[in-house]
């Protein structure tokens, strides 16, 4: 299967691209055809055949990560060529083997700081005027933003919904 790894490497975070991609090659979905789509504000001339650079504006952190779903939807034609896509924070590493068990329409990561907490303790958006509003007593899990993905049609639909809101 064809897999696309998405990440944002702006400002000083460009230094983490190589180590992330090395850990992906070593531990993530071995045996599959893996490519990367790197969103960056740096001028990069030489990249390998399996890495595509998408140039974005230079903006201070955390603006680029807040705009991630905007970037993804602008590259929907490219991302749609893959069987699965996964966003990974560029400063993470894959330390253990991850196999086909990760495949799903949409995949997300439970936030480790909230694993054993009751949903009343989750830091959901509680302002009713927000499009991210979760009423008291609702919600099942609290998700981390550093890793998510799935089949492109589902991932891009989710991304577009986030952009629209």
Language-model features and meaning:
Residues 1-64, 75-81:
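N-terminal anchoring/stem segment of glycosyltransferases
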Residues 6-9, 38-41, 88-90, 109-111, ...:
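Short His-Asn-centered micro-motif
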Residues 62-66, 116-124:
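Short, charged, surface-exposed secondary-structure boundary motifs
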Residues 17, 47-48, 96-99, 159:
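Short glycine-/acidic-enriched loop or helix-start segments at secondary-structure transitions
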Residues 69-118:
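GT-A fold catalytic core of metal-dependent nucleotide-sugar glycosyltransferases
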Residues 137-165:
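Catalytic core and acceptor-binding pocket of nucleotide-sugar-dependent glycosyltransferases
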Residues 123-140:
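Short, flexible, basic/aromatic active-site loop/helix in glycosyltransferases
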